[in-house]
Amino acid sequence: MALRKIRIEQVNSRDGFEQFARLPFQVYAERDAWWPPDVHNEIDLLSGRALITAHLDLCPFAAFSDGRLVARVSAVVNHRYNEHWKEKLGQLIHFEALADEEDAVAALMEEALTWLERRGMNAARSGFAAFLDYPYAIDNYAELPSFLLRGNPDFYHRYFKNARFATEKGQVDYTAPLTPEIQTRYRQMIEAAQATGAAIKSWREFGFLAAIDAWTDITNAAFDRHWGWNPITRAEVRPMLLPLQPTLVADLSMIGVVDGQPVGAVFSVPDLSGQLARLRGGIPLPPERGGGTRGALVNIGVIEAARSRGLARAMAAQSFLAMVRHQMRFAGYTLVIDDNWPSRRTAESLGARVTGNFVTYRRDLP
């Protein structure tokens, strides 16, 4: 069999960005259900127009085999992350590839890793970066994952292992059935937190813009030493979340208040599969996966001084009860690092069980 001609290019044109951003439509073309990328936002990031790029050095790479685009990845130096953690860690984001392209992917990885090494990075991570990258699924390959999470093909793991990456962290995704019995327990959790002097308000009740700013500040404080996190700013979060004000996000997301001050926050979304997922006609989603019946708690945090009063549980419970009022039958609790036992115990107390597993990869350089 004739060898294919492999070519690796740095992407630096509008047409190139467009082609880069649309590769997932080939990778997942045969899937019954998947989350397509926001092509416009991805092009803004690649071209340096997104606010977050003020903190990044970013270079997208594309792999071509016999002239056909078959794989992509972006090499990133996130200065804000490295300053926060005092590390020299590079990131590989946007990774997607077609099947049976081992040679092209190997060449792509080496080109991107060399780019990071030349910028002084001593390690590379793929599969976790705040607002930039999410971990790789290791099960449920044929199913629609929770909102924001990857539903990658299984062969991606061979690509990373062949590129000498190792698993750095595991993560889990939870799902809770919103049964009448568990709803009673949720109300008890809320009452217990209220008895300590805490109040829980939806973002709509708190004021949506004020809630966005509170969420930003609380998340920065609560996640300050959380693996993989880096600080974010109100200026970059506001334009991302303000468009959600007219949606159910305002009713499902919560702010925990103690002594008049916001000390806890939950960001939750309704079932977005009907609006954002790419679904093959005539194939229904399982109710615990979507189809209008699965909300998701995406982020939860409580500042250290307000912990140990059950506020995280109570905010999640309030969010899940709001989902019930809007006809949702299942709630996701997404995404928890394997060894984050406080958050895992919170999920379990809410009646949730692990329904998806994910990993983040790392490779030392050179």
Tell where the protein language model's regions lie, with residue ranges.
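Acyltransferase donor/substrate-recognition loop-hinge adjacent to the catalytic core
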Residues: 3-6, 150-228
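A conserved beta-strand-loop-helix scaffold within acyl/acetyltransferase catalytic domains
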Residues: 24-65, 73-83, 210-301
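Acyl-donor binding region in acyl/amide transferases
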Residues: 83-164, 283-349
